[in-house]
Structure formats: C-alpha cells, structure tokens
Design a protein with these regions (language model features):
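Class I S-adenosyl-L-methionine
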Residues: 1-134
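Glycine-rich phosphate-binding "P-loop"
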Residues: 70-71, 170-172
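Conserved phosphate-coordination/catalytic loops
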Residues: 76-81, 172-179
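Conserved proline-anchored active-site loop of SAM-dependent methyltransferases
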Residues: 84-92, 97-114, 120, 124, ...
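Conserved Class I SAM-dependent methyltransferase catalytic core
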Residues: 121, 125, 174-235, 242, ...
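Switch/connector loops and helix/strand junctions flanking conserved nucleotide-binding motifs
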Residues: 164-167, 205-207, 236-238, 256-258
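Flexible, glycine-/basic-rich loop-and-beta segments that form/coincide
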Residues: 235-283
Length: 283
C-alpha cells in the first residue's frame, strides 16, 4: 500500500472549489473531471480551513474559537506530516486494527500499513465523503462518535478529536469532547491496546484541579507519556500559537504482572529536525 504524496506547500482552497469537489464526489465524476485523489488529499481542508476568520484578528485563541464554533464544528484536520510522524513512532504492522474515532478526511489512514484494517467515524458528511473516496478499503461510517459501536476491538486508536466542545452525558454530567474521546477509546481498545491522542496542552495539566479526570483516565489506562507539539503544528488549518500535546496511553490488562503506570503532568518537548515537514509550517 503506497500512501498519497504530500506536497511541500498545501494550497489554500476556496469554498467554491470545495463545492465543486463535493459535487464531483456525489456524482462519482472526479476522474472524468481530471481531479485525482492526490488533488483532493492536498487541497481539501474541511470546515477548519474554510471559516474565513483569521486568528490574528482576535485577542486570544478562546475568542477566535468562540467565533469559529458559530460556523463549524471545531474541525481542524491533522496535518499529514504530523500524522506520518505519529504513525511512524507507533511502528504499526499490517495486521494491527487501527481506528480514528473522529477521522475527518482520514489523514491518519494515508500512512497506515494496511488500509483494510483502518476504521473511522466522522460526523461531517462532506469530510466523510472525502475519506471514503480516498480510502475505499477502509471501514468508514458517517455518524457521531457517541453513537459509534463497531463490532470489533482495536490494537490502536489514533486521534485529534474536537477541542473544548462540552457534551452532556446520559447521567447528566458534562464532559469535554477530547475527554470523551479518550474514554470511548478505552471501551474500544483491546487489553494493552494503545491510544495516541492530540489534546490541548491544558488537558490534565494540573494534578489538583484535574484530579477527578486523572483518576478517570487511570482507572482505564496505564500512562505511557506525553510530548508538547510545535505551536505552529496546525498553522496550515488557520490556527497558529495554540498549545497542544500528544499523549500516549495503554489500556489496562487484568494480568497480575501488569502494574499500571500512574499519570504525570510532566510533558517533554518533542525533538523534530529543522528540515522535517512538521517544522516547515512555521515558515
């Protein structure tokens, strides 16, 4: 399986061009129009890149995010170089079952060793249509993560869930979307399965104020570690300077010889060579 090539500079896409792509997808006429899968992969950005708002026009990210939420679903697709870096670090095999529970256009899937073992859920019908076009052998459903119930369990769950959406749970408690993503992953992972998830740097950052959420995670996972991501990691999607981190968790096993590792708020700085595509976004 050969992944699609990522161009050095992904071009901005206009709403008009997006509408044309979606019409071609609906009519299955992309090939006739000369639009290749690589064209779609390198130019489709989703709601997060089409909101028409500029981060620089707002005093802080929270103000920018509040305005953006009125137009979209907090949707910023994970940049392909970052997806490739995460997948490479996990050293997946072609027999591993891998899920992205809010897969967007499926950028993580482009770097998996076996597309047939990829599973995804995406609430936005347009992004889901793009993902299905690019990865026809993957198992991709259109729907809400809260309703996603695949008939299998996974070796790995990867993800960049929406940030700071607040969802009311059946028991009337309120939970952030990224915390819910982690708990849903725990339900769907095999014992000792790995969760690699991008979250805001503020998630579980304070051992006192976040102790309830930390206990909730520790009841399901053994903590493996976390690293800060470059602040410009999502600049291609219109957000620059918003701190995020990458966390790794391993689902607990009932085996007596498996002592879970407790969570630590320590967060390492990831080393990325200056020539790596993830760093190129700052240029």
């Amino acid at each position: 399986y050969l992944p699609m090539k990522v161009v050095a500079e992904r071009q901005e896409i206009s709403p008009k061009y997006l509408e044309q792509i979606l019409r071609l997808l609906q009519s299955e006429a992309c090939e006739q129009a000369g639009v290749t899968d690589e064209d779609i992969f390198n130019r489709y950005t989703g709601d997060g890149g089409l909101h028409g708002l500029r981060r620089s026009d707002y005093e802080n990210y929270n103000a920018f995010s509040a305005a953006k939420k009125e137009l979209e679903n907090g949707q910023f697709f994970t940049p392909p170089p970052l997806c490739e870096m995460i997948v490479s670090a996990l050293r997946l095999t072609d027999t591993d079952l891998v899920a992205d529970l809010t897969c967007g256009m499926g950028n993580f899937f482009n770097f998996l060793p076996n597309e047939r073992n990829a599973y995804g859920c995406e609430v936005d019908p347009n992004a889901c249509a793009v993902a299905r076009k690019l990865y026809p052998q993957a198992h991709i459903v259109q729907g809400d993560i809260r309703d996603y119930e695949p008939q299998t369990h996974f070796d790995f769950v990867l993800g960049n869930p929406p940030f700071h959406l607040r969802w009311i749970m059946p028991d009337a408690t309120v939970m952030t979307s990224h915390q819910y993503y982690c708990l849903k992953a725990a339900k769907l992972l095999k014992p000792l399965g790995i969760l690699a998830v991008i979250v805001p740097a503020s998630f579980l950052a304070d051992s006192f104020s976040d102790k309830g959420a930390i206990r909730m995670m520790e009841s399901r996972f053994s903590f493996l570690g976390q690293v800060m991501l470059p602040e410009h990691a999502f600049s291609d999607s219109g957000v620059d300077g918003f701190p995020t981190k990458l966390q790794f968790w391993q689902k607990k096993s009932t085996a007596a010889d498996r002592a879970p590792k407790r969570y630590s708020t320590d967060c390492a700085d990831i080393y990325i060579p200056s020539g790596h595509p993830v760093m190129a976004a700052s240029a």
